[in-house]
Amino acid sequence: MPGVIMDNATTGRPGHAPDTQTPSNGDNLRNGSFHINGAAKGDKDHDPDKESYAGKPRIDGHRALPEIPHITQGFFPFSTLVNRSVQQCWNELSDLITELAAIHVSPHSSVPLLPVNGKSPGNQSPENVQKKLRILDFAHAKRAEFIKLLVLSQWSRRARDVSKLIDLQNFIRARHQAFVDALQRVGEMKRDLVQAQVANPDLQTALEILSKGRLESLADLGYKSSKLLTARGALRRLHKINRIISARLALHDLIPHPFRTYRVHDGRVTFVVRGEFELDLSIGAESELSQFFFVDIRFLYSPSSNIPKGRMSNEIDAKINEKLRDSGLTGCFNFLHGLVLTNKIHILFKQAIELAKGLWSETLRVELLHRTLVIQYWTLKPGPKSWIEIGVKSGNGDADSQGLGVPCLGLRWMRDGQEVNSRDIEFDPEDLSMECLLRSVIALHISYLLSSAYGILSEYSLFSSGTLSSHAILNVTEPGECQLSVQLTGSRHLRVSIEPMSGAVILSATPGLLERFESDASLDRSTIDDLVARVSRLRCIAAIEELESNVRILGFETVSPKGLRNDIRKVFPANVLRFSLFWHPLWERNWVVAATSSITSDNWWVVRLRRSSEVATDFSVSDTSVPLCSGHSMSDTFLATSHQTRSSSFPDLGYCLSGMVAIYANVSYLSDLHSVEFHPPLCALKVESDLQIPDIFIRYQVSNLPRALQLVLPAGLKRKNLLKDTVRLAFHGIDRHKNSAIFVAYGNLVGPWTDLCTLISKSDSSLVFKQGGSGFALRLLAPAGRPVIVQLFKSLQTLECTLSILDFLRQRRLTPQSLSLTHIAFAYGPGRDLSATIEMGLSEVPSSAELDPVRVLARTDPLLCLTLGIRFKHPNPHRRVQGSLAAILNHASNEAGLDFVTEVLSFTLPLMRALEQITSNASRQEPFRLQVIVRNAYTFLLHYTYQGFRFQLTTRQHSGQLTWVLRELSSPEAGPGHDQFKARLRGTLYHSKGNGWKGLGNGVVADAEGVSNVIRALDGCFTGAQHNTWLPRETKSEQDYSTQPAPENQSQTGAPSQAGMANDTKMTANFVNDKSLQRNPVVSNAADVITID
């Protein structure tokens, strides 16, 4: 019994060792010595798993019975289990401690919780509760495991009796198996002895047969020979059989639907299946339950042959009779129908092989896959392949099958790699001809190609208007009669046909015309697209040559396509056969316009050529899927020709094309973004009849912008929809000084705004507000061909942010002074004598590659981030906390932000003015006496270096309102007169009170206005305390407290470290809850004040 736990200390009786235990009953004496978990003394060779011993002679001389084998396999000491459980508990406890240490527990909220039942609830944050639950679950689990160990310990004290029971059970099982094996062997022996038995010879029967030649004991069956059947009798019997068959078929047998056509004659029934076979069956008994028997079969399709006599005929005869016996007429039909279908497929296969070896050599490919015949035609033709498949098709729901659920031969036509309907293919299942089938398929294929080409040509304006004519002759059975005739000019015609066997296109025209354009055509193309391209090219030659001569007069330069590294032909549609490129000196080199001519119309195109450096930077050379140029048709007529008679045609056309290049770049960018609605769409972007450049109307909604283009605002600044959702982007010419296109975005504000025009600086030309209205205009500059959409969205969102800040300042009754897209200046203070500037800094505009629409849509992180800053000029006292206020503006918490900054300015103004007054040293003759370290806007450290005193000034909630608390911090070194200063501080501050402040015994609490009195009183306690050796000490103190963190004991007594100070500010003031207030160090202008943010 594996897994038995033995406790060595308690296996035997109490007080006895296991190996010295003696038997206490007669059984043990009869079986010899009793051993536990081992051999007896003096036994050296024993099995560690099973131990047995031969019997020893007893006193009376007889051998004793053998010892029962003792089982020790699977036993292990109980101490091992205890040790492993303890080790596992220790390991899991270590893992639990590591896991709990990784869970960050948020500190207590600054709002104190009321005690419940006289006990403090403690920290009830989710993280802390989770930690407690994990500890409790671990304790419960380990408690249950050790309870199990206790139960096992109690059970192991009785393990000796269980071990005896195991040994006894093993002995009984061994004896039982021995009895079973003995019975099995006896049975096998008895079975083998049967083969050894030999019957006794029957000598009497053998003697009678040898002597008389017969055996009298055998019975005579009394068979009589039949009479000869006469002609009349045979006819009578045949009529009787006909009646029996007719009655049976009409009343009893289930006839399948294909066997409904039959006739009864000559003692047999003939079933006729049209196009397949005739089957003759007869009966062998009058009973209606007897089976039909096969007589003969004849095939009704050609080519076919009778079944040859011999082995094949016998096998088919036996197989049909078996089907009639087992499945009746239905099983017989299914067997013969499948046999016929398979035979037809093999006949067609042989015919296809003969064709592939004859006239259709190298143009056919034949494969037989099980019962599916595949014939591929036009094998030498490049491109998608075409083939037909002939196989057995299920007849379920098929009207063409011979009956419901009856399979039949089916065709599957794959034309140019795509499956098409095969109902028009001429295929006779009764007269099998693979050549006729192929001719029908190829004729339908050729008819499809020529009719498609005819349809394309008929849609062109030249043919639909009747200027040119075309007609097609089609045939569904004979491919040689299919042809297409096209009128090229008034006197020239072209006839197109396709060779049936190879699929090659044959063009028949006048020799001169054919030689001229066969050289331009590709030899690999064999579809009707070649014909359309060649016919279209004829008309395009004269149109382009005339256009080039007219445009050169207007001053454009012709660009040769061979000098471009880009394949310019890929830009235009396939029907454009002739084109010419032009460039203007005012444009960038990567932009050209193209005049194209096709069989449908003449067009001006704007084409952007990608530079080779762009390709090398963004895309690999081997990537052929990336377009190297792009273009758009912007007119349906040649504008140069229509304006060539005007003297000002060149400036008008140059302005028009320059505007189209600039507008097209922006519309194309909007089209690639997909999420922004605009008008007109890219496909409808056209030059108007008077050469006016169309404007772009954009629906501006921040929620519809891609994630990467949405401006990320600080958490404290709420996004407001202050602009109407329609913005008009217009082209306003070219700035020749900057060689850039000028765009103006016109929009309207949601509500009325006053005095916006007065706040805009006259030197800022990028933003203009309408006088007395809600309209505004943004001026944008970009090189011609570079989109300004990202710049537009950034400016619009920045404008909304600027207006939101302006609206907030007015709600707080602060006085705005100036306004732009980069800053807002305002005045604050009791007399509005102080000014501050909120700066709006945007992240750097990414490169052109990063602003690609595909990359913009794929990005999940924003590209545009707004960072607010605040700037104070000298002598504004708040300049010392400028960095901390800027961090609050950009804090990740929703509680921080502009609202919080305005409160900070109001709350800290008295303090900052008092510190500014004390630390100012205009003459620079008085030595430094006070060092101020600004941790953040709500935490200050005041250090009197000479006297050796350090104070911490922080905010606390006192009597339900935010107050200033001044506490003295321990100093590593005491200065001269330390006790006198200490007594002066107690009398003046700690045990006193004044206007707006009150002593606390070990500190001072003051409101926002009274803190200035506290600072002045504190400074008065140290006024005049100077020392001649203060400079070295100040240098050492400045190094200790300005560049190094406070010691650990000081952090516990009231001088926390930089990170701890930020956390303490968060808990007490409930305004700032992150360490981000400790960034961007800003040093004040006074040399005796150090600011650490």
Swiss-Prot record:
Location(s) in or outside the cell: Nucleus
Biased composition (Basic and acidic residues): 41-62
Keywords: Activator, Nucleus, Transcription, Transcription regulation
Domain of life, source organism: Eukaryota
UniProt GO cellular component terms: core mediator complex; mediator complex
Compositional bias of kind Polar residues: 19-31, 1040-1056
Disulfides per UniProt: none
First-listed, main subcellular location of the protein, grouped into a coarse class: nucleus
InterPro entries, A to Z: Med14_N (IPR055122), Mediator_Med14 (IPR013947)
GO molecular function: transcription coregulator activity
Pfam family, one: Med14
GO biological process, one term: regulation of transcription by RNA polymerase II
Region annotation (Disordered) ranges: 1-62, 1034-1065
PANTHER family in UniProt: MEDIATOR COMPLEX SUBUNIT, MEDIATOR OF RNA POLYMERASE II TRANSCRIPTION SUBUNIT 14
Summary of the function given for this chain in its UniProt record: Component of the Mediator complex, a coactivator involved in the regulated transcription of nearly all RNA polymerase II-dependent genes. Mediator functions as a bridge to convey information from gene-specific regulatory proteins to the basal RNA polymerase II transcription machinery. Mediator is recruited to promoters by direct interactions with regulatory proteins and serves as a scaffold for the assembly of a functional preinitiation complex with RNA polymerase II and the general transcription factors.
Subunit structure and binding partners: Component of the Mediator complex.
Sequence similarity: Belongs to the Mediator complex subunit 14 family.
Name of the protein: Mediator of RNA polymerase II transcription subunit 14
Gene giving rise to this polypeptide: rgr1
